[in-house]
A protein has these predicted regions:
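Non-catalytic C-terminal accessory region of glycerolipid acyltransferases
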Residues: 2-34, 45, 165-300
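A transmembrane-helix-recognition feature enriched in membrane-embedded lipid enzymes
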Residues: 23-80, 108, 115, 120-121, ...
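Catalytic core of membrane glycerolipid acyltransferases/transacylases, capturing the structured
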Residues: 48, 89-165
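A generic local structural motif
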Residues: 64, 79-83, 112-113, 173-175, ...
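Helix-to-loop junction immediately C-terminal to a conserved catalytic motif
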Residues: 68-100
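Conserved beta-strand scaffold positions in the cores of enzyme catalytic domains, especially
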Residues: 79, 125, 151-154, 223-225, ...
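Short, flexible loop/turn elements at secondary-structure junctions
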Residues: 83, 100-102, 129-131, 194, ...
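Hydrophobic helix-cap positions at the C-terminus of alpha-helices
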Residues: 85-88, 116, 179-183
């Protein structure tokens, strides 16, 4: 009988260790780096990305969000390599790393996932906090466009960084690592370039930022490269183009990447940069495939 009790205790201990950990929260010092409004915005958005609330907003995102994006793009959308997304282990988080040319890049990617795949998922898109977490308009956009999925926020990135908020960014990275390391169905969308590429050439890219390398080194998620082309930054023009001859929107999903070589390396900024360069090389390969097939006939 004692053996049965011992075995049951071991099973219960294993169950507890296998259960996902609670969502990380910022320390007092990290939270103090934010303004009053930013704290309120973060508290609300953080709560909306947990438990029942996250499931509710994910349903809204999959039904309403993906629905209107589909209606606005169905004549233009072309998807390639979706079988690579289907082939990953959906009991583990998936990190999608994509080039960044339009405000709407990840919206069309999320619509594709919700409409073309059936496995349970919840999406997270780390963003610059300077818009989405600093004023009511930004919060409203996060609600109606992202269904609160633009989370966690980073403030010391891109143009006009705010160094005083660096302590909070350290928390956001820890939280992003947690989301990328544990949680069945977690899908994290990330742009290695760190900002929108405004070059007229859709096959040109910016240098990757080291943050993506640190994320992968710390979390070791499944990673798939994505190349997106054909999207505008003008919302009315983009929607009207669906019926009046707009550019075709092409999304290429690559094969899952083997990053074991980098995971085994020293935890150093140089390693982070090497990972970023490797990711962009894989996105470039997808871009070259697109160029070879469509480069001379952009409207095809």
């Amino acid at each position: 009988m004692s053996d049965e009790v011992l075995a049951r205790a071991k099973m219960e201990q294993a169950d507890r260790s296998a259960a996902p950990t609670e969502a990380l929260l910022p320390t007092f010092e990290e939270f103090a780096a934010l303004s009053t409004f930013e704290r309120v915005a973060f508290r609300l958005t953080h709560r909306m990305n947990l438990g029942t609330w996250k499931r509710f907003w994910t349903w809204c995102q999959s039904f309403f969000g993906a629905g209107w994006i589909h209606i606005s793009t169905y004549n233009l959308m072309r998807i390639y390599g979706l079988e690579n997304v289907e082939a990953v282990d959906h009991s583990r988080p998936l990190l999608l790393v994509a080039n960044h040319r339009s405000f709407f890049d990840m919206y069309v990617v999320s619509t594709t996932l919700f409409r073309k795949t059936k496995w349970q998922k919840q999406l997270f898109f780390p963003v610059r906090g300077r818009f989405y977490y600093q004023n009511p308009v930004g919060m409203f956009v996060n609600l109606i466009m992202g269904w609160w999925s633009m989370y966690p926020p980073f403030f010391v990135t891109g143009k006009d960084p705010v160094p005083a908020k660096r302590p909070f960014d350290k928390y956001s990275m820890r939280r992003l690592v947690q989301l990328s390391r544990e949680g069945a169905g977690n899908v994290v969308g990330f742009h290695p370039e760190g900002t929108r590429n405004k070059n007229d050439d859709p096959y040109a890219f910016l240098r990757p930022q080291p943050g993506i390398g640190k994320l992968i080194k710390d979390a070791n998620p499944q990673v798939i490269p994505v190349f997106i082309t054909g999207l505008s930054n003008n919302l009315p023009k983009q929607v009207l183009g669906n019926w009046f001859g707009g550019d075709k929107i092409r999304i290429h999903f690559g094969r899952q990447l083997d990053l074991s070589e980098f995971i085994a390396k020293k935890d150093h900024v140089r390693t982070y940069k090497e990972i970023g360069e490797f990711l962009m090389s894989k996105i470039t390969e997808l871009a070259e495939q697109d160029r070879e097939e469509f480069g001379e006939r952009r409207q095809a």
